[in-house]
């Protein structure tokens, strides 16, 4: 059998017009209640079915196809007041309608199903096997919550599924339990305006996933291991100084105020999230700073690292969650080496971390946009090595040390129109460099991340400018003191 279903922009499904409502007939008062019908279908089977679903309600229509549909239900009693558990099995291929794909996703369900009756809604307990289901086909349903376009994402899951819907007034809601392995593969996401590559990866494997949710209970999520392979991320600081990844999910719009007084809704219980070791394999990050003029971009490649287990749980009330061990290695701009290590917790609120980073032999000329903004000169040649240590306390207090080694630094001519202080930076470089042309600078930095005026990069460059000023004036101060000036 083949079925084509469509929902128009007004939300009406065309199948609703297939059946005419039964005429209302008066029931004679006999004084006796009619015996309810009892129907039992021992075995119902459907083979080789297909379903086409088109939905015009979202701004971008949804087009989904299901074929090779095989369904078997046993002990079906549709009129029973108390529904039995019915053995059910389903196999199907699922594809995104309108796209050419040789191998669509596959879905297999094998378990028991119970139909709604009384206060009990639909319930299902089964083994579920989903292979490369086209999640991107459903993107129009949540597109209004995302500041990105999901071009492709294939979702897989293998494990158990238990779900039930309660219709009772005392504890209504959905109960869901998952236990198995999940994957999100071949993800491709672009920014909306302008359309630029934003995120992609070959494989995100989530092994040993356990998820439980129930009415009036906290959401619990536990993962044994996570592996992200062959991934890319574009990180952009926009002209207003915002980082693009912070705004990928739009905040929920507030509900319209009600004129009717209502009892406050109970506060949602905080979730319990526990994540095992995370591995990052063969990553690449393209960093673009559009806050600086001219713009600056850097390409980080061969990024491989690991993060140990972490959670949002606290040992005692008021105590921050424990930090996880971090290690990350890679290359910057193809030649410089990058090594990051330390401790952090992505789930900690507020943010807390203690990390160290080492960069060796980064070519300096690409950093000219920063030197033009803060020193007024472009960079002709030189290499940069950096040892940094950053520690952020739960109260937002930052303590950082920055050891900066500049090797064979050479500035060009002053850039016309630069608003940076007009300092003789070439003289300062000559005074700061040793006999081998190496400048070694140590810049401690501290401040509060809760201060909206606190910006780390400009602060470091201002410190360098101040250091240049001191380097220039120091020899003359020494000469003046020698002659009693």
Predicted regions and their residues:
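Secondary-structure transition motifs
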Residues: 1-71, 148-152, 173-174, 189-305, ...
């Amino acid at each position: 059998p083949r079925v084509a279903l469509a929902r128009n922009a007004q939300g009406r499904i065309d199948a609703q017009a297939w059946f005419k409502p039964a005429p209302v007939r008066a029931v004679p008062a006999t004084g006796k209640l009619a015996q309810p019908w009892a129907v039992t279908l021992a075995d119902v089977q459907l083979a080789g079915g297909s379903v086409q679903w088109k939905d015009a309600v979202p701004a971008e229509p949804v087009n989904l196809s299901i074929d090779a549909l095989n369904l078997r239900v046993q002990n079906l009693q549709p009129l029973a007041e108390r529904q039995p558990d019915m053995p059910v099995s389903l196999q199907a291929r699922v594809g995104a309608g309108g796209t050419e794909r040789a191998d669509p996703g596959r879905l297999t369900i094998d378990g028991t199903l119970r139909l709604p009756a009384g206060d009990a809604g639909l319930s299902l307990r089964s083994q579920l096997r989903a292979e490369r289901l086209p999640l991107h086909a459903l993107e129009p349903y949540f597109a209004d919550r995302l500041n990105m376009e999901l071009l492709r994402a294939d979702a897989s899951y293998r494990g158990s599924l238990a779900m039930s819907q309660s219709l009772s007034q005392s504890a209504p809601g959905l109960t869901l339990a998952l236990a198995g392995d999940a994957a999100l593969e071949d993800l491709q996401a672009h920014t909306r305006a302008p359309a630029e590559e934003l995120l992609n990866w070959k494989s995100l494997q989530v092994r040993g996933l356990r998820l439980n949710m129930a009415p009036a209970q906290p959401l619990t999520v536990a993962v044994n291991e996570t592996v992200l392979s062959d991934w890319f991320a574009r990180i952009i600081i926009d002209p207003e100084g915002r980082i693009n990844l912070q705004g990928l999910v739009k905040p929920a719009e507030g509900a319209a105020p009600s004129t009717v007084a209502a009892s406050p809704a109970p506060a949602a219980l905080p979730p319990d999230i526990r994540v095992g070791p995370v591995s990052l394999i063969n990553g690449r990050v393209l960093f673009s700073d559009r806050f600086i003029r001219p713009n600056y971009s850097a390409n980080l490649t061969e990024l491989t690292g690991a993060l140990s287990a972490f959670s949002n749980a606290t040992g005692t009330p008021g105590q921050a969650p424990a930090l996880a061990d971090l290690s990350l290695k890679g290359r910057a701009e193809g030649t410089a080496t990058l090594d990051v290590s330390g401790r952090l917790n992505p789930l900690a609120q507020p943010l807390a971390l203690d990390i160290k980073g080492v960069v060796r032999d980064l070519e300096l000329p690409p950093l000219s946009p920063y030197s033009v903004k803060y020193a007024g000169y472009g960079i002709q040649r030189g290499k940069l090595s950096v040892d940094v240590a950053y520690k952020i306390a739960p109260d937002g207090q930052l303590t950082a040390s920055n050891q900066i080694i500049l090797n064979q630094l050479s500035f060009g001519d002053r850039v016309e129109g630069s608003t940076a202080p007009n300092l003789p930076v070439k003289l300062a470089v000559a005074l700061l460099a040793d006999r081998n042309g190496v400048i070694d600078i140590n810049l401690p930095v501290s401040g509060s991340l809760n201060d909206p005026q606190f910006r780390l990069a400009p602060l470091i460059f201002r410190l360098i400018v101040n250091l240049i000023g001191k380097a220039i004036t120091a020899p003359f101060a020494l000469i003046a003191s020698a002659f009693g000036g």
